[in-house]
Amino acid sequence: MLYIIRHGKTDWNVEHRLQGQTDTELNEEGRRMAREAATEYANIHFDVCYCSPLLRARETAKILLDGRDIPIIYDDRLKEMGFGEFEGLKECFSIPDCPVNVFFKDPANYTDPQGGAESMDSLFSRTGDFLEEIEPELEAGKDILIVGHGAMNSSIICRIKYNLDRKRFWDEGIPNCRLMRLM
């Protein structure tokens, strides 16, 4: 089976800042959320955990799997989508002409990333490569956990559940520290 979870809360989540690949840590609420998730999901079997190398995901994985003999493998392809010069921007949704708003409001039409932001094609390519690589493990019956991020997780969900239909990209966003079984 394949499971996916989003990291715990950070100060930037609370402040509504665009995190992207900026390496922020969990805040105390995020650590509490991860501890609660560890208790809630303690009886779910995982053979291996693949995790974004960004600190907020690493912290979540370590807390979530503390005391369990589950290897954590960090993979750059699981980093959050990059938002370039817009990372750190507060309340970007309230800025009408902010170019990354298209990604959040109408992802099917996010075709011209600006300011060094990552394209959806790039995001889908790297997460697709990752999924192809772990496919033999899934076929062998391994239970795999992915610890990631909002947009990165959505790219995997969109590929598996919606055949890359970009109109459905945000249909099943995962709240912080909530687990979803994908297959």
What is each residue range found by the language model?
Residues 63, 155-159:
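Active-site signature of alpha/beta-hydrolase-fold catalytic machinery across serine-
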Residues 42-45, 134-142:
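Glycine-rich phosphate-binding loop signature in dinucleotide/nucleotide-binding domains
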Residues 10, 152-153:
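Short active-site segment of divalent metal-dependent hydrolases/proteases
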Residues 51-52, 125, 147-148:
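Short beta-strand scaffold positions
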Residues 161-183:
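Domain-level recognition of soluble alpha/beta enzyme cores
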